[in-house]
């Protein structure tokens, strides 16, 4: 007919007796239907309506069986639902009251790091420093990390988010000259240097993944990225994140032997298990590197949770 199909999901199910009668004989289930409808009086039934499936999408299917499977999975995918964009209910550590460093103290320390400056853009400066040279800035980075991560239901629960890896990793950060504050930061691990001094256990990522022997030589040409954030005060701006990414390219100019960036990325538990399963499936199908994917194993592998949905059918 050339019209789109709209998937509609009703939350809930008929009684166990209804399904039992259906196993005895399909007609018994039909006889039971009026009662199943009447026993829903004064009950709230959630209804979710999905995006229309265009006729052009429908035409791509060559068999009714494949189309039916697709429609079935599109409908039951609505069973998982994002209720709001409020992450506060995920914060198990309570309200975070940041204890920032005095802006004048930060500004004074910034003045001593002119040799670490990579570039300037408007009122922003990008720096690349060692931990030992920026004690006050590192404290502020730890405060803003914790503040940012708590805002999305994560964080450490401590007053500042710093750890032992910070002490020998490098730090890329953006400074706002006008507001005298840290806008965002990245932690960078120069893998070759770290492995030489601390062994493979010196890499943060090694606490989450196990690298097989054939992968180790590639780490000598790799920078490990992590702990990135943009301060809450600047998250509505696009520029800070763009400047951090630009900073990564400037770092590459300082280390011409580097060929790879690696690093773990969090998927917030705010997303329902089905949504996380979709993300992982998509990344594996579309972006996995066959050369390297078999050389790194997660210590705690992701367990797909798709319920009644066949992720591969969508």
Predicted regions and their residues:
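Short, histidine-centered active-site or binding-site loop motifs used for metal coordination
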Residues: 51-53, 130, 227-232
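Short catalytic/ligand-binding loop motif for oxyanion handling, primarily in non-cytosolic enzymes
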Residues: 14-18, 56-58, 182, 196, ...
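Conserved N-terminal entry element of GNAT/NAT acetyltransferase domains
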Residues: 92-132
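Short amphipathic alpha-helix that is part of the acyltransferase structural core
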Residues: 118-161, 167, 171, 183-184
């Amino acid at each position: 007919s050339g019209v789109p199909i709209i998937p509609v999901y009703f939350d809930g199910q008929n009684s166990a007796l209804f399904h039992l009668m259906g196993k005895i004989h399909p007609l018994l289930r039909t006889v039971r239907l009026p009662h199943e409808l009447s026993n829903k009086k004064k009950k709230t039934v959630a209804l979710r309506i999905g995006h229309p499936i265009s006729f052009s999408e429908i035409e791509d299917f060559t068999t009714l069986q494949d189309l039916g499977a697709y429609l079935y999975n599109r409908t039951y995918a609505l069973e998982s639902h994002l209720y709001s964009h409020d992450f506060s209910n995920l914060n198990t550590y309570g309200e975070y009251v940041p204890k920032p460093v005095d802006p004048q103290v930060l500004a004074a320390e910034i003045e001593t790091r002119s040799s670490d400056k990579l570039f300037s853009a408007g009122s922003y400066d990008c720096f690349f420093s060692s931990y030992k040279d920026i004690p006050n800035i590192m404290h502020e980075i730890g405060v803003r990390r914790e503040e940012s991560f708590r805002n999305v239901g994560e964080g450490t629960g401590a007053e500042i988010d710093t750890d032992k890896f910070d002490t020998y990793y490098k730090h890329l950060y953006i400074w706002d000259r006008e507001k005298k504050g840290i806008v965002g930061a990245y932690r960078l691990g120069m893998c070759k240097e770290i492995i030489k001094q601390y062994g493979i256990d010196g890499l943060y990522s090694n606490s989450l993944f196990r690298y097989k022997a054939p992968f180790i030589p590639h780490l000598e040409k790799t920078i490990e990225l992590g702990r990135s954030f943009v301060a809450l005060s600047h998250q509505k701006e696009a520029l800070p994140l763009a400047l951090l990414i630009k900073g990564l390219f400037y770092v590459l100019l300082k280390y011409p032997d580097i060929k790879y960036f690696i690093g773990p990325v969090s998927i917030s538990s705010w997303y329902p298990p089905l949504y996380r399963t979709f993300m992982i499936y998509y990344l594996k199908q579309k972006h996995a590197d066959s050369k390297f994917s078999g050389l790194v194993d997660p210590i705690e592998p992701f367990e797909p949770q798709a319920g009644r949905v066949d992720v591969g059918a969508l």
